[in-house]
């Protein structure tokens, strides 16, 4: 009898800072898609993000601390070790080499990322290397309608993971931290 393939979720991001929303999405994807683990991959220099980013080594350490109590979550510094901007294609190639052909990969992304996927570097190759999970708020499927259609035109599909809406964002957390306001129960 053949062994079942491993199913690995990849949750990449700036994590500027990591917060409960990231952890909730990872946990829900783990359960909904029968993943063996979720790998958090903080970006050193994210190509699609703002420049007001907490220093990479601190973001990496924050993510490590945030996932410590969950044995199904691990953190990879693969993008931190690269010079310059890091692209998802390079990260997925790395994980394919590490885990081998008996592993299926699922790239977990939020609504804003899903909307921008068609513009990503090497997106066509990415479609061959992983499946995508779009973590969206209830009723927000219309927000990614064009992306769903785009996936369909390429013979691919995107899995939808409806997550509870949280009025919490990394931008709001940075604002609170800058102004000395409490972030208790948010991080």
What are these regions (language model features)?
Residues 1-187:
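Nucleotidyltransferase catalytic core that binds NTPs
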């Amino acid at each position: 009898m053949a062994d079942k393939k491993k199913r690995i979720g990849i949750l990449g991001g700036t994590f500027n800072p990591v917060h409960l929303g990231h952890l909730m999405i990872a946990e829900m994807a783990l359960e909904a898609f029968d993943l063996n683990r979720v790998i958090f991959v903080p970006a050193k220099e994210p190509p699609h993000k703002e420049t007001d980013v907490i220093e990479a080594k601190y973001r990496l350490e924050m993510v490590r601390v945030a996932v410590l109590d969950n044995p199904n979550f691990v953190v990879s510094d693969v993008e931190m070790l690269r010079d310059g901007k890091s692209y998802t294609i390079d990260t997925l190639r790395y994980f394919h080499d590490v885990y081998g052909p008996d592993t299926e990969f699922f790239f977990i992304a939020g609504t804003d990322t899903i909307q921008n996927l068609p513009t990503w570097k090497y997106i066509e190759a990415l479609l061959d290397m992983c499946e995508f999970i779009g973590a969206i708020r209830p009723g927000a499927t219309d927000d990614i309608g064009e992306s769903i259609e785009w996936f369909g035109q390429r013979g691919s599909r995107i899995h939808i993971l409806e997550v509870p809406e949280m009025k919490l964002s990394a931008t709001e957390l940075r604002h609170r931290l800058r102004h000395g306001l409490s972030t208790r129960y948010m991080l």
